[in-house]
UniProtKB/Swiss-Prot annotation:
Family annotation (InterPro entries): PS_Dcarbxylase, PSD-B, PSD_type1_pro
Gene Ontology MF terms: phosphatidylserine decarboxylase activity
Catalytic-site annotation from UniProt: 89 (charge relay system), 146 (charge relay system), 249 (charge relay system), 249 (schiff-base intermediate with substrate)
Protein name: Phosphatidylserine decarboxylase proenzyme
Subcellular location: Cell membrane
EC number(s) on file: 4.1.1.65
Record keywords: Cell membrane, Decarboxylase, Lipid biosynthesis, Lipid metabolism, Lyase, Membrane, Phospholipid biosynthesis, Phospholipid metabolism, Pyruvate, Zymogen
Length: 283
């Protein structure tokens, strides 16, 4: 725990938003020499498997961000026939039941649904006895996010906030981390009731985006997007791409009807998992 505190302490002191803006600038630079240097060093440092990428040649990407949100060959991530599939490549930080509206962040640390979604009590009440899974995407992982289940898009809320790292050490130290960081809460209707996918920002995450909106502009103000009427093609099928991170981060998946979700027993905190793998059955 002491090591975690030492690792995390500098994050309270550094200008996280300024560093993130600078990182975002360089990630979009198209100068061949600079972008190739950044991409090739990243591949070496994190041992990225480019054989899975739709475009295998690192030099073929226009900028670092294009490389980072690279598409994978479809055959590399076959979709299981499970009722609920994993929406990302990553690691399970925590998974289980929402207890009286509280989600487990790490041992001994909790945060509320209402804090996470920045919503009123009536909406949060729907998830009081729900189920959740927190999925951490490491730098080497595929950073596009897909649908875990067929769903109808309802609305989206951009919530400004801090930009702490979301690495495991930080989650063990910073209270209510996912409810403090910048995030995008996306609300859906499914055949078993409401579902929310929360895309959490972090240090040097240049942008969070969705397939229907593109990059969501960073702001100091909370912003809501209502798709109840103007969005025509609202049904997004299981496995379809719905968003991406330009660096970072974490996805928190919430289901309101907890009694209907039975998580795969092999899924434990710390488990690695890939897009398309079984996550839960609907009972």
């Amino acid at each position: 725990m002491f090591r975690d505190v030492l690792k995390t302490l500098p994050q309270y002191l550094i200008p996280k938003h300024g560093i993130t803006a600078l990182a975002g600038y360089f990630a979009d630079v198209k100068n061949p020499r600079l972008k190739n240097f950044l991409i090739q060093n990243f591949i070496r440092k994190f041992d990225v498997d480019m054989s899975e990428a739709l475009i295998e040649d690192p030099k073929s990407y226009d900028c670092f961000n294009d490389f980072f949100i690279r598409h994978l060959k479809p055959e590399c991530r076959p979709l299981s026939q499970s009722d609920v599939i994993c929406p990302v490549d990553g690691c399970i930080s925590e998974i289980g039941k929402i207890e009286r509206g509280q989600l487990l962040q790490a041992k001994g640390k909790y945060y509320s649904v209402q804090e996470l979604l920045a919503c009123d009590g009536q909406l949060a009440e729907q998830f009081v006895q729900g189920q959740f899974a927190t999925l951490y995407l490491s730098p080497k992982d595929y950073h596009r996010v897909h649908m875990p289940i067929d769903a109808e898009l309802v609305s989206m809320t951009y919530i400004p906030g801090a930009l702490f790292s979301v690495q495991p050490a930080t989650t063990r130290v910073v209270p209510k981390l996912f409810a403090r960081n910048e995030r995008l809460a996306i609300f859906f209707k499914t055949k078993i009731g409401p579902m929310v996918m929360v895309m959490v920002g972090a240090t040097i995450v240049g942008a969070i985006g969705t397939s229907w909106h593109g990059d969501v502009k960073r702001s100091k103000e909370l912003e809501r997007f209502d798709y109840s009427e103007q969005f025509l093609d609202k049904i997004i099928s299981q496995g379809s791409e719905m968003g991406y991170f330009k660096l970072g981060s974490t996805v928190v998946l919430l289901f309101a009807n907890g009694e209907k979700i039975q998580w795969d027993k092999e899924l434990l905190a710390g488990s690695k998992i890939q897009l398309g793998k079984p996550m839960a059955i609907i009972t």
